[in-house]
Amino acid sequence: MKTILFLITAMTVCYQCYAQNDVPSADIQIKSALLAAPQERRDSCTVYGHAADKQFILLRKGTNELICLADDPNQAGLSVACYYKDLEPFMQRGRELRKQGMNDQQIFDTREKEVKAGSLQMPKQPAALYVYSAEDKDFDRTTGEVKNGYLRYVIYVPYATAASTGLPEKPSAKGMPWIMNPGTYRAHIMINP
């Protein structure tokens, strides 16, 4: 009896691991990625996602200025993003460094050196990033339906500070804009509704 119970438990765990890493269809990836985009721009965004072998690929070529990223099937929960096209060199470099095995701090430091050296360009004007997320239990990977999703807003303003923007470095109320990484190449305004 113990052996049967163990085998059932092991099979359930293995199934959950397999299901967690299953790559949704291109249609589902596009549908969920577009949840991060402003409603009026969703029809013409470029969308990147993952092939069945989990390689990062172009799923749909768009005609507007926004690039959306589908959820990473290797991560728990749902996290999709959409950003202004001028952020693509910064975002792509982050993906490359992550693929090389770097952690968050190493990626931050490497990109900072590259921005200062002029080999990595940041936008010259403010640039938006939208991130939509949900817990695993609230995302159906077979239909793309999401319950209890959360959308946060980021506006990149390289080298801006609290003094240059009038924004605090920490929010003191829900939904209050604040500046993160002030004074760095990666300074950005956070808005968490």
Regions found by a protein language model. Give the residues of each.
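Primary mode marks residue(s) on the alpha4-beta5-alpha5 output face of response regulator receiver
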Residues: 21-193
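Bacterial Sec-dependent N-terminal signal peptides
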Residues: 1-21
